Amino acid sequence: MEIVIMIQEALKALRRGEIVLVFDADNRERETDMIVAAEKIKPEHIRIMRNDAGGLICVPVSWENSEKLGIPYMTDIMEEASGRYPVLGKLSPHDIPYDEKSAFSITVNHRKTFTGITDNDRALTIGELAGICRDDRHESFGDLFRSPGHVTLLRAADGHVLRRGGHTEMSIALMEMAGLTGVAVCCEMMDDRTGNSLSTEDAMKYAREHDLIFMSGAELIESYMEFRS
């Protein structure tokens, strides 16, 4: 399938609330993530990610929405608190082998959830977060959510894939190209047999068997650059 056609099919799938698969790069995490639009999230998406992917279910948030929500990078929180808790300074992730900085932010639950971990609770939290970003109600974030929680937020870099080539930014690039709210859901695909990340070949096989779009990060970034030009 030609890249242009494949990307267009992926964007249509995202608008329909379907999952797409994205492999980042051989010189990065070497992982394939399941990605779906946060505003389309349902408990069944959480179940599929939990059972078929098995990694950490996270919520990439665009730089613009992160700024409006006021969510910091976790590393900034740790740095601020290291004066009182010196161990946090020692735990700084300055030696990540595949990147310069972690995208991790805070964890949240919606206040209507119970424990926050069930498929229903996580879908509620994610969907409501996408909703306040879509409707430009960012100021209600603190009233509607509590932290810590069971949904991990990832803060995308300013400029997204033009500045950083992580799944966080690639997820947001897909949302932008699809005309969707700049909040996504992603989960790394793991391999039960090896205990490692699922190989690209097996991820592509999964995509074929489940009629899902699979793309590489290079294809996504190339398409995004054309989209922005």
UniProtKB/Swiss-Prot annotation:
Oligomeric state and interaction partners are given as:
Homodimer.
Site (Essential for catalytic activity): give the residues. 150, 188
Instruction: Specify which residues bind Mg(2+) 1 according to the UniProt entry for this protein.
Output: 29
Catalytic reaction equation(s)? D-ribulose 5-phosphate = (2S)-2-hydroxy-3-oxobutyl phosphate + formate + H(+)
Query: What UniProt keywords are attached to this protein's entry?
Result: Lyase, Magnesium, Manganese, Metal-binding, Riboflavin biosynthesis
- The catalytic activity of this protein is classed by the Enzyme Commission as 4.1.99.12
Its Gene Ontology biological processes?
riboflavin biosynthetic process
- Required cofactor(s): Mg(2+); Mn(2+)
Which domain of life does this protein belong to? Archaea
Task: Return the cofactor note field.
Answer: Binds 2 divalent metal cations per subunit. Magnesium or manganese.
Query: Could you name the Gene Ontology cellular component terms for this entry?
Result: cytosol
Single annotated GO MF: manganese ion binding
Name of the protein described by the UniProt record: 3,4-dihydroxy-2-butanone 4-phosphate synthase
